[in-house]
Structure formats: structure tokens, C-alpha cells
Design a protein with these regions (language model features):
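Acidic/polar low-complexity surface segments
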Residues: 164-167, 193, 218-219, 240-246, ...
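Extended HEAT/HEAT-like alpha-solenoid repeat tracts in very large eukaryotic scaffold/adaptor proteins
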Residues: 299-303
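N-terminal targeting and processing segments
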Residues: 73-146, 157-161, 316
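Blade-level signature of beta-propeller repeat domains, shared across WD40, Kelch, NHL, RCC1
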Residues: 457-481
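Ankyrin-repeat and related helical/solenoid repeat scaffolds used for protein-protein interactions
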Residues: 390, 397-464
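Well-ordered beta-strand segments characteristic of repetitive beta-sheet solenoids
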Residues: 105-110, 121-127, 144-153, 168-179, ...
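Beta-strand-rich extracellular passenger or scaffold domains
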Residues: 114-117, 130-137, 157-162, 182-190, ...
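Terminal non-domain segments
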Residues: 1-111, 480-481
Length: 481
């Protein structure tokens, strides 16, 4: 990290908190004029650029690569063959927990009992039991750039009422690894796989788990990398905003789910100004977000947000800006590889690129249902942006309002492609292969709906089986055998 003064470190912490939490009000978060409150965003971004992010990420990834799960399990099963402690360390046993004081920081080793951890440490290793973590649980902070928790087994509860918890890398690296059990993770902001000028990881290898947090969590990256990875079990994820595969400025947010019938929810707290009392911001579930220049406000290109679910019958519940969407040079991807899935959203979702961005939703198989209540979704590109919804099989149903199902607007490019099955497409207007004309850039918009692989399909706007329709204003609706 480049040398930073205490004032600069304080500015970074306040700026991060302001952008991701304090600026959250019942108003439009895409109206960047509302973000011109102190701390000054330009000062914050210029200070952040002083940090050697590449060096910081390299150090964190070297640690991550050294975390071999098979090695950890072998280590647990053969503790008597390993030397846990080194000369010069101060060892302080207290019941089932041993405190180890080293020149690098505190390490804690817990036995197989039901332990309670309230103190943060450089490293916590728990060998089993139904434990409670009331601390940061693998969260770095100023003055403590690294922290790791490894819990081998048990039905554990991770509870934090403060920011930065449960696998959070803030100006450093934070890692939380849970190797089994039905666990509950409850946190506020910057948690559950969150990286800001650092790397944050939460890895859970199995069980029926529950994750709840507020903002910037569950795989969120901002000038860093945030990762949450689950290998199996029927899991539940609940967040308010900026979560579940969210990438902000120069950030990568990853949410990886291996198997199980999972439920993802994001939204319900902050109303969107376009439909007060009816719609809420999600900014989650594979969403890349940047700051659009507004007046004298500094702009910054968005990051990359990815949600990848390998298999299971899953439910994705979001509202505005969700489910494979990008805003202002951001890239958002939601990929589901197998299962009969339900996607529910409001607007700017389900493969939507908004303002020079890209949004992609791909579903490889299963009988799926897609609902975008207002629209501007389901393969929509708006304002020099691209949006793709790609479904590779199954009997699917698409329901939207307007500007959806292969729609381009404001010089955008939108595609919905469905390969195989008996599919149904319902839309009010401006879609199913529709491009609006915008003359101020001397460019056109393009909208394409492809349905291939045969099947008996239904279209609300006049499409027919085994026929290609060329729509006015650069639109194509093609149903091919």
C-alpha cells in the first residue's frame, strides 16, 4: 500500500461508508447529484488511487491460494503430528480455548466444544462444535490488515452489529472459512465476502445456511474483490442493496453457489423515486455499477458483478437494477446452469444494460419463469448499452411491461434468445424484437428476439411459429425450427 496519513485513512473509511451506506435515502441512487455531500467524492477517489491495489490484491491472493481445503481437513484429523506453537509465543489456555500471543498478533485455537468468540484475532481456528462468533469473524481493519477464521464443523452462528465482518477485506484481507454444518450469518454492512481496497472472502462448504446483511455484502467489490462461495445445501440469501455479486468502481463482486434449491432476495428497503411506494432499489444479483458524471460530480466507471449458481431449483427476487444488469460502464452477469428457476424483478433487470453498460442473464436449462413487472428488462439495451437474456432450453415463460424481450432504446442493443421448448412471451408494448429510433447521435437502436429449436410458442405482440418478422425501427422477431 502506498503511504497514507491517518487523515487519508480516515477519509477512505468515511468515503466508503458515505457512498455505500450513508447516502442511501428514499431517493434515486442513480441520481449522482444526490451524492455531493461530504466527504468530497473527488477527494475520496483521488486518495484511493494512492493505494497500490495491485500489490495489496497480490498479497491477499497469495494467502487465498495457500488455503487448501483438503490440507485443512488433513491437518484437523492429524493434530498430534503437527507442531502448533513456536518458540517465543505466549500460550494461555482458558478452558476449551487457547490464546496464543505472537509478535504478529493474537491467534486463538478453539476445541470441539460449543465456544463463544467475542475478541478479534489475526487467526481463529475452531475444531468443532456449535459455536457463536460475536466478533468480526475474519475482517480486516485499519491497523489490522489481515484476519482469518477457520471453523471445521458444527451448526454455527455468526452475528455482528457493526460494519466490517464475516470475511471482509477493508484496506487488507479478510477470510472466513466454514467447513460444514447448518450455519447462520447475520451482519450489517461491508460483510459476508466484501472487498474494499482489499480482498474479502466467505467460503462455506455445505449445509443449509442462512445469510442476512444490509449493504455492500454477499460478494461485493469496490477497488477490490469480494467473494462468497457456497458448495451445497438449500440456502437463503437476504440483503437490502449492493449485494449478491455486486461490482462497484474497479471492483469485482462474486457470488458462487454450487448446488441446492436456493432463494435470493435483494431490496425492499430503499424506494426508487420513479415509483415511490411501489418499487425499491436492489442493485444486486449480478450488478455492475459506476458513478455517472452529474454537474460537477466526478464520474467513475463501474465494476463487474457476477452471480453464478450451478444447479438447483432457485428463486431470484429483486426489483430495480438486478439479475444481470449494468450501469455506467459496469458489467453485470447472472448465470444459472441447471434447474427450474423463478426470476422476479421490477425494472432494469434480467439482462439489462443501462447507460454505456452491459447486462447478461444466462440460464442453461430447466422450465423457467421470468417476470419483470415494469420492464426495460429481459434483454434490453438502453443508451448506448447492451443487454442479453440467453435461455438454452425448457418450457419457459416471459412476462414484462415495456421495452423488454429483445429491445433497444436510446441507441442500445438488446437480445433475448431462447433455444428449445414450448415458450410463452407476454409483453404490453415495445419489445419482442423492437428498436427505437434516436436521432440526436445519428445512431439507431436494435432489438432481437430469437426462438430456436422448434416448439409451440406464443407471442403477445403478433409473433408466429416458424416465421421471421422484421419490425419497424430495427427489430427482428425470429421463430426458427
Amino acid at each position: 500500500m502506498a503511504p497514507l496519513t491517518l487523515d487519508e485513512k480516515d477519509l477512505l473509511h468515511r468515503g466508503i461508508r458515505h457512498l455505500m451506506v450513508d447516502s442511501l435515502q428514499p431517493r434515486d441512487l442513480t441520481d449522482e447529484a444526490a451524492l455531493k455531500n461530504p466527504p468530497d467524492i473527488s477527494d475520496f477517489l483521488n486518495t484511493a488511487l494512492k493505494v497500490d491495489v495491485q500489490k495489496l490484491l497480490s498479497a491477499s491472493f497469495n494467502i487465498a491460494r495457500a488455503i487448501d481445503l483438503e490440507m485443512l481437513l488433513e491437518w484437523k484429523d492429524n493434530l498430534d503430528q503437527f507442531s502448533l506453537f513456536h518458540e517465543g509465543w505466549i500460550i494461555e489456555p482458558k478452558g476449551d480455548i487457547t490464546y496464543v500471543y505472537t509478535r504478529h498478533g493474537l491467534m486463538i485455537v478453539g476445541g470441539t466444544g460449543d465456544n463463544v468468540y467475542e475478541q478479534d484475532a489475526l487467526l481463529i481456528v475452531d475444531l468443532g462444535g456449535n459455536d457463536r462468533y460475536l466478533n468480526g469473524a475474519g475482517a480486516s481493519r485499519i491497523g489490522h490488515p489481515f484476519s482469518m477464521v477457520i471453523d471445521f464443523s458444527g451448526d454455527d452462528v455468526y452475528l455482528s452489529g457493526a460494519d466490517h465482518a464475516q470475511g471482509a477485506g477493508i484496506l487488507g484481507g479478510g477470510f472466513l472459512i466454514d467447513l460444514g454444518g447448518d450455519d447462520r450469518y447475520l451482519a450489517e454492512n461491508f460483510a459476508q465476502g466484501a472487498g474494499v481496497l482489499g480482498v474479502g472472502m466467505l467460503i462455506d462448504t455445505g449445509g443449509r445456511d442462512e445469510y442476512r446483511c444490509h449493504s455492500f455484502c454477499q460478494g461485493a467489490g469496490f477497488l477490490g474483490v469480494g467473494l462468497i462461495a457456497e458448495s451445497g445445501g438449500n440456502d437463503q440469501y437476504h440483503a437490502a442493496v449492493y449485494a449478491q455479486g455486486f461490482g462497484f468502481i474497479r471492483g469485482l463482486g462474486l457470488m458462487l453457489e454450487g448446488a441446492g434449491d436456493d432463494r435470493y432476495f435483494a431490496g425492499g428497503i430503499y424506494p426508487d423515486y420513479r415509483e415511490p411506494g411501489k418499487a425499491y432499489l436492489s442493485m444486486s444479483q449480478g450488478f455492475g455499477y459506476g458513478i455517472r458524471p452529474w454537474g460537477d460530480l466526478a464520474g467513475a466507471s463501474g465494476g463487474i458483478g457476477i452471480l453464478d449458481d450451478a444447479r438447483g431449483n432457485d428463486q431470484y427476487l429483486g426489483d430495480y437494477f438486478s439479475q444481470g444488469a449494468g450501469y455506467w460502464y459496469g458489467l453485470g452477469i447472472l448465470n444459472d446452469s441447471a434447474g427450474h428457476d423463478l426470476y422476479t424483478a421490477g425494472r432494469y433487470s434480467q439482462g439489462a444494460g443501462i447507460h454505456l453498460a452491459a447486462g447478461i442473464l444466462t440460464d442453461a436449462s430447466g422450465d423457467d419463469h421470468y417476470l419483470a413487472r415494469y420492464g426495460v428488462s429481459q434483454g434490453c439495451g438502453h443508451d448506448l448499452a447492451v443487454g442479453f437474456l440467453l435461455d438454452n432450453g425448457g418450457n419457459d415463460r416471459y412476462i414484462g411491461g415495456t421495452l423488454s424481450q429483445g429491445a433497444g432504446n436510446g441507441n442500445g442493443f438488446g437480445v433475448l434468445s431462447d433455444n428449445g421448448g414450448n415458450d410463452e412471451y407476454y409483453l404490453r408494448d415495445q419489445g419482442q424484437g423492437h428498436g427505437n429510433t434516436e436521432t440526436f447521435r445519428r445512431l439507431d437502436s436494435f432489438g432481437i428476439l430469437f426462438d430456436t429449436g422448434g416448439g409451440k410458442d406464443r407471442y403477445s405482440l403478433g409473433g408466429h411459429n416458424n416465421k421471421v418478422n422484421l419490425h419497424p425501427q430495427w427489430g427482428i422477431q425470429a421463430d426458427l425450427p
